[in-house]
Swiss-Prot record:
This is NF-kappa-B inhibitor zeta. A motif (Nuclear localization signal) lies at residues 164-179. Involved in regulation of NF-kappa-B transcription factor complexes. Inhibits NF-kappa-B activity without affecting its nuclear translocation upon stimulation. Inhibits DNA-binding of RELA and NFKB1/p50, and of the NF-kappa-B p65-p50 heterodimer and the NF-kappa-B p50-p50 homodimer. Also seems to activate NF-kappa-B-mediated transcription. In vitro, upon association with NFKB1/p50 has transcriptional activation activity and, together with NFKB1/p50 and RELA, is recruited to LCN2 promoters. Promotes transcription of LCN2 and DEFB4. Residues 58-83 have a biased composition (Low complexity). GO terms for biological process: B cell proliferation; B cell receptor apoptotic signaling pathway; cellular response to interleukin-17; cellular response to lipopolysaccharide; cellular response to transforming growth factor beta stimulus; chromatin remodeling; chronic inflammatory response; cytokine-mediated signaling pathway. SMART domains: ANK (SM00248). Residues 321-394 are annotated as: Required for transcriptional activity. The keyword Transmembrane does not apply. ANK repeats lie at residues 443-472, 479-508, 512-541, 551-580, 582-607, 612-641, 648-681. Transmembrane segments: none annotated. Coiled coil: none annotated. SUPFAM superfamilies: Ankyrin repeat (SSF48403). One of its GO terms (cellular component) is nuclear speck.
């Protein structure tokens, strides 16, 4: 190390700058005295050159080290001093050093201070000076190429702005919520990092010289040519036009921020594009909805409304491949109200329905100031559609929801075929007189009887209403049957229900004393029976289930007798797959359903006929009808009629035991015995069931069953 004295004040400024830049300080006074003792003599300047050439800057020494290697430390420091003198300019010749502590030094003038040179700092300064030379050469190259740097003065001033920008500082005039970001990569990262001994102000003083490198200028050129100040919080969206919207004022930005987003209306299924290419614009123009050559004037932004808002951006010209449609025209106006009313068919209730072809009057009043230039349908299209509707009533073109909300149209849509037929029949019978309605043929049948027999429901309904108005609904033909009874016999359950609802009497009888229920029971019309019950409940009529015919039979008796006949035919027929057997099976099923329906309606099984006093169980036992016997005995009240006697004193067990040549006789007797029939009961001739059993193998089995039961009952209690 070498201690240099500053000789004169002429180079004092440069020396102070070097001293301030070095920031070298002595760490110990012992080292200072030690340093003075280790100074080489002034007569050896060549030794310094030799040592610098041999050692060089590769072996620097610490200024505060206590090493004993004096030659190494002194040689490195002397080299640093030589370099310092070469940078600072010509120095004055060294004066003879005064002898201090036995060592001679050159005299350099009055002592002004001590500077300790740091070799590491000198190395950094050397590297920076090399960069400054390279940057100066690059600037000269750019000047020779004709690059104008004046146009980038504004950017350079922004980049070289002194000091670190603080948080609250705003670089734009806009509000803080939409402040545009500066797209400069060198703004937050300075090109050089100052050392701890340097201040930020010194760094910014040297910054303009160090930023003039080739890479920095190239980055500035790229930033200026390619980028524009765009806010990171704002997305510019355009449906068709890719032109960048110019930067708006802070007031407009604030209004956009608080007022909500405003988009242009979708142009006829147009795809969503953001700054698309020209080729994409041509493809998207095919789907444009607005008319050709339509330019919307720029309007100020309004507050958000539920109505349709449009963008103030100009619409680009159409593509050559664009095909005009019905709604395109040179003039754009809203459709007149008269044409819309004709299109909707005078539907007053459909005004509240959202229709793409029409806007409500209230909406038009609200937006009349700024939507007068925007059209959704030209007047020519309205006229074309009105003319098309007038030309053809059965046109397929119709507006959606045009029939909604109209009570007449709702009734029209909900009308059934029967209602339409009734209207047709009423129009046909409008001119029929009263005498013609009441006229009869040779058999005493009226128009109503004939219509019911033919199954013409609509005509029967119209005639029945007209006959009921004349109080002639229950008029009868030559057999004493009314139109209602004819409908029951014809198995027209719908007509039966209509007639009962109109007012036909359900308990009327014919010439045989049969009520409509007797006819249903004999024929097995279970659906008609249900229709009578339903109609009677609706018309508040009482149905007499115990009414008897001239034979004294109730409807249930008639149904059992009819079923016995079918069972007898099935037992006698030996061809199970013949058509006759299939028909009998169907009739058998219908009769069983009719009997069940009668029981459900409330028919009494224990009811007796007027002539013989037989119950329904007696009638079922006469044919060994297992199906009906089982049906009756499964009722909760079976014990009240299982031992019921007829007028001759016979029970159902007497009847079943006395049968001959019946395949199901044994099963019928066993079933009756199991359900509580008494074999000891005697009739008027003092006969028990066992006395009536015929001879034969089947008779022996029946006697065994009856005796076994009777023996158990007659057994003595001991």
């Amino acid at each position: 190390m070498i201690v240099d004295k500053l000789l004169d004040d002429s180079r004092g400024g440069e020396g102070l700058r070097d001293a301030a830049g070095g920031c070298g300080l002595m760490t110990s006074p012992l080292n200072l005295s030690y340093f003075y003792g280790a100074s080489p003599p002034a007569a050896a300047p060549g030794a310094c050159d030799a040592s610098c050439s041999v050692l060089g800057p590769s072996a620097p020494g610490s200024p505060g080290s206590d090493s004993s290697d004096f030659s190494s430390a002194s040689s490195v420091s002397s080299c640093g001093a030589v370099e310092s003198r070469s940078r600072g300019g010509a120095r004055a010749e060294r004066q003879p050093v005064e002898p201090h502590m036995g060592v001679g030094r050159q005299q350099r003038g009055p002592f002004q201070g001590v500077r300790v040179k740091n070799s590491v700092k000198e190395l950094l300064l050397h590297i920076r000076s090399h960069k400054q030379k390279a940057s100066g050469q690059a600037v000269d190259d750019f000047k020779t190429q004709g690059v104008n740097i004046e146009q980038f003065r504004e950017l350079k001033n922004t980049v070289s702005y002194s000091g670190k920008r603080k948080g609250p500082d705003s670089l734009s005039d806009g509000p803080a919520c939409k402040r545009p970001a500066l797209l400069h990569s060198q703004f937050l990262t300075p090109p050089q990092t100052p050392t701890p001994g340097e201040s930020m102000e010194d760094v910014h003083l040297n910054e303009p010289k160090q930023e003039s490198s080739a890479d920095l200028l190239q980055n500035i050129i790229n930033i200026k040519n390619e980028c524009s100040p765009v806010s990171l919080n704002t997305v510019q969206v355009s449906w068709l036009n890719p032109v960048v919207v110019p930067q708006s004022s802070p007031a407009e930005q604030c209004q956009d921020f608080h007022g909500g987003q405003v988009f242009s209306p979708p142009q006829k299924c147009q795809p969503f594009q953001v700054r698309g290419s020209q080729q994409m614009i041509d493809q998207a123009s095919l789907y444009q909805y607005s008319p050709q050559n339509q330019h919307v004037e720029q309007q100020p932004h309004y507050t958000h409304k539920p109505t349709l808002e449009y963008s103030p951006f100009p619409i680009p010209p159409q593509s050559p491949a664009y095909e005009p449609n019905l709604f395109d025209g040179p003039e754009s106006q809203f459709c007149p109200n008269q044409s819309l009313v004709s299109l909707l068919g005078d539907q007053r209730e459909s005004e509240n329905i959202a229709n793409p072809m029409q806007t409500s009057s209230s909406v038009q009043q609200q937006n009349d100031a700024h939507l007068h230039s925007f059209s959704m349908m030209p007047s020519s299209a309205c006229e074309a559609m009105v003319g098309h509707e007038m030309a053809s009533d059965s046109s397929n073109t119709s507006l959606p929801f045009s029939n909604m909300g109209n009570p007449m149209n709702t009734t029209q849509l909900g009308k059934s075929l029967f209602q339409w037929q009734v209207e047709q029949e009423e129009s046909k019978l409008a001119n029929i007189s009263q005498d013609q309605f009441l006229s009869k043929d040779a058999d005493g049948d009226t128009f109503l009887h004939i219509a019911v027999a033919q199954g013409r429901r609509a005509l029967s309904y119209v005639l029945a209403r007209k006959m009921n108005a004349l109080h002639m609904l229950d008029i009868k033909e030559h057999n004493g049957q009314s139109a209602f009874q004819v409908a029951v016999a014809a198995n027209q359950h719908l007509i039966v229900q209509d007639l009962v609802n109109i007012g036909a009497q359900v308990n009327t009888t014919d010439c045989w004393g049969r009520t409509p229920l007797h006819v249903c029971a004999e024929k097995g019309h279970s659906q008609v029976l249900q229709a009578i019950q339903k109609g009677a409940v609706g018309s508040n009529q009482f149905v007499d289930l115990e009414a008897t015919n001239y034979d004294g039979l109730t409807p249930l008796h008639c149904a059992v007798i009819a079923h016995n006949a079918v069972v007898h035919e099935l037992q006698r027929n030996q061809q199970p797959h013949s058509p006759e057997v299939q028909e009998l099976l169907l009739k058998n099923k219908s009769l069983v359903d009719t009997i069940k329906c009668l029981i459900q309606m409330g028919a009494a099984v224990e009811a007796k006929d007027r002539k013989s006093g037989r119950t329904a169980l007696h009638l079922a036992a006469e044919e060994a009808n297992l199906e009906l016997i089982r049906l009756f005995l499964e009722l909760p009240s079976c014990l009240s009629f299982v031992n019921a006697k007829a007028y001759n004193g016979n029970t159902a067990l007497h009847v079943a035991a006395s049968l001959q040549y019946r395949l199901t006789q044994l099963d019928a007797v066993r079933l009756l015995m199991r359900k509580g029939a008494d074999p000891s009961t005697r009739n008027l001739e003092n006969e028990q069931p066992v006395h009536l059993v015929p001879d034969g193998p089947v008779g022996e089995q029946i006697r065994r069953i009856l005796k076994g039961k009777s023996i158990q009952q007659r057994a003595p209690p001991y």
